[in-house]
Amino acid sequence: DDVFLTKKLNADGCHLGQKDMNISDARKIIGNRIIGITCHNSIKLARVALLKKADYLAFGAFNLSETKKVKYKASINTLKKAKKITNKPIVVIGGINSNNYQKLLLNKANFLAISGYVWNNKKLKPVEAIKKLKWK
């Protein structure tokens, strides 16, 4: 969310939410580094992000999440529609775990945002949680 920190750390890129800095201003600061945009459950927001040259799109929440309060509910249909309008990578977020990730991958999600599953998992240590995400 922090373009200035991205530049200071010489990071590969950053992710911008709808209430963060706009992508045009971010590009002026970090140039051609990766910028991803939150699109919630909206193909309209995705189209705007693509016009502004986002490098990837993020949709969610696909499930209930303990990491953030769910304000927008995305669906497999949202993911399918997004894949029809772009070849850019799609990140899926929101309550993703070892019981529900495969359906998202089968529907062509490129990346899984799984911080809550990894770091807040009450049953598994982080490495164990990640290992459980094997393609079955």
Task: Label the model's feature ranges.
Residues 1, 20-42, 70-98, 130-136:
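Alpha-helix-loop-beta-strand connector modules within alpha/beta enzyme cores
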Residues 1-2, 12, 20, 55, ...:
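Acidic side chains
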Residues 3, 46, 101-102:
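Short hydrophobic/charged patches on amphipathic alpha-helices used for structural packing
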Residues 6, 26, 49, 82, ...:
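Generic structural signal for hydrophobic
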Residues 7-16, 37-86, 121-129:
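Glycine/Thr-rich beta-alpha phosphate-binding loop at enzyme active sites
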Residues 10, 14, 33, 91-92, ...:
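Generic detector of intrinsically disordered, low-complexity, polar/charged segments
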Residues 18-25, 58-70, 101-135:
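Glycine-rich phosphate-binding active-site loops on the catalytic face of alpha/beta enzymes
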